Amino acid sequence: MPTPKKKTSRSKRDMRRSHDGLTAPAIAVEKKTGELVRPHRAHKGADGALYYKGKQISAAK
């Protein structure tokens, strides 16, 4: 297997790794129930109904 001809500098190594960092998912607090939810997504409440933007969009099955 070939080896590098020149040593990679700290700057080049760190610039390459600059995109490797992980970001935590965004979390919002539901206004009515106070539970933690992902924003811009529908979620199932404790009663089994679907909620979006604080409004019930589907009844429990």
Swiss-Prot record:
Keyword Transit peptide: no
Keywords per UniProt: Ribonucleoprotein, Ribosomal protein
GO CC terms in record: large ribosomal subunit
Gene Ontology MF annotations: structural constituent of ribosome
Biased composition (Basic residues): 1-16
Disordered, as annotated region: 1-47
Protein name: Large ribosomal subunit protein bL32
Species: Bdellovibrio bacteriovorus (strain ATCC 15356 / DSM 50701 / NCIMB 9529 / HD100)
Gene giving rise to this polypeptide: rpmF
